[in-house]
Amino acid sequence: MSNVTIYATDWCPYCRSLLKGLDGQEYDLIDVDQDEEAGEWVKSVNDGNRIVPTVRYSDGTHATNPLAAEVIAKIEALA
C-alpha cells in the first residue's frame, strides 16, 4: 500500500488531469463508481458531496481536487 490513495472516476476530467500529472508516482487508485464504501468516505470528508478527485494520505489528512504538484510534495514529505 502506498502513502496516497486517490478516489476518482473514469469519466472525470479533473481526475484524468491529476493522474496524468502523477505519472511515475506511486499511489493507490479507487473508482468510487465501483466501490460504494469509498464513495461514502469521499462524501464524509466533502460535506456530503461526492467530489472527485479526493486524495487520502497515510498521515490521515486528505485533499479535494488538489494540484499534482501538491500531491507530489506530500508524497515526498511522507517518504
From Swiss-Prot:
SUPFAM superfamilies: Thioredoxin-like (SSF52833). Changing C12A: Abolishes activity. GO terms for cellular component: cytoplasm. Its main location: cytoplasm. One of its GO terms (molecular function) is oxidoreductase activity. Its EC number is 1.20.4.3. It is an enzyme of class 1 (oxidoreductase). InterPro entries: GlrX_actino (IPR011915), Glutaredoxin (IPR002109), Thioredoxin-like_sf (IPR036249). It comes from the Bacteria. It catalyses: [mycoredoxin]-L-cysteine + arseno-mycothiol + H(+) = [mycoredoxin]-S-mycothiol-L-cysteine + arsenite. It is found in: Cytoplasm. Residues 1-79 form the Glutaredoxin domain. The keyword GTP-binding does not apply. Pfam families: Glutaredoxin. One of its GO terms (biological process) is response to arsenic-containing substance. Keywords: Arsenical resistance, Cytoplasm, Oxidoreductase. NCBIfam families: GlrX_actino. Involved in defense against toxic arsenate. Involved in the mycothiol/myoredoxin redox pathway which uses a mycothioltransferase mechanism; functions as a monothiol mixed disulfide reductase and is recycled by a second mycothiol forming mycothione which in turn is reduced in a NADPH-dependent manner. Belongs to the glutaredoxin family. This is Mycoredoxin 1. The lineage of its organism: Bacteria, Bacillati, Actinomycetota, Actinomycetes, Mycobacteriales.
